[in-house]
């Protein structure tokens, strides 16, 4: 059973998936930082100094705890998603372009088999004798 698991875990697809998940997690952190620390402050400045993470709507009812709808945080998370989705789209587009270029390369002429080479030699010898 251990051997079976070892074969499964060391297959190329499983390792590729693991690497993809790790890189994807790190990329997600980079995008979150980009949105939180660069894009949203600039966007907040453009629209009048608004801090999007602080945007919220509070629903209150007498005698109960208030319910807070943090729509600013939702806007920020939506920006995260859009940037990640666009980045993945561009990556797939570039990857597809490279794959198409590889497929379009003409295949080199196949090397003649031993039989074909022998037949060519026999033909050449017969031509020489005829002349």
From Swiss-Prot:
Location (main, coarse): membrane
Alphabetically ordered keywords of this record: Cell membrane, Ion channel, Ion transport, Membrane, Transmembrane, Transmembrane helix, Transport
GO MF, one example: mechanosensitive monoatomic ion channel activity
Subcellular location(s) of the protein: Cell membrane
Top-level taxonomic group: Bacteria
PROSITE patterns: MSCL
Role, per record: Channel that opens in response to stretch forces in the membrane lipid bilayer. May participate in the regulation of osmotic pressure changes within the cell.
UniProt family annotation: Belongs to the MscL family.
Protein name: Large-conductance mechanosensitive channel
Organism: Alkaliphilus oremlandii (strain OhILAs) (Clostridium oremlandii (strain OhILAs))
Source organism phylogeny: Bacteria, Bacillati, Bacillota, Clostridia, Peptostreptococcales
């Amino acid at each position: 059973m251990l051997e079976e698991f070892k074969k499964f875990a060391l297959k190329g697809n499983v390792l590729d998936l693991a690497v993809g998940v790790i890189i994807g997690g790190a990329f997600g952190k980079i995008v979150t930082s980009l949105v939180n620390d660069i894009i949203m402050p600039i966007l907040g400045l453009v629209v009048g100094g608004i801090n999007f993470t602080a945007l919220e709507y509070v629903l209150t009812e007498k005698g109960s705890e208030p319910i807070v709808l943090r729509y600013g945080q939702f806007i920020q998370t939506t920006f995260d998603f859009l940037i990640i989705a666009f980045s993945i789209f561009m990556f797939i587009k570039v990857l597809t372009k490279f794959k198409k270029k590889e497929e379009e390369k003409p295949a080199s002429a196949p090397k003649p088999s031993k039989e074909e080479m022998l037949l060519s030699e026999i033909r050449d010898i017969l031509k020489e004798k005829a002349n």
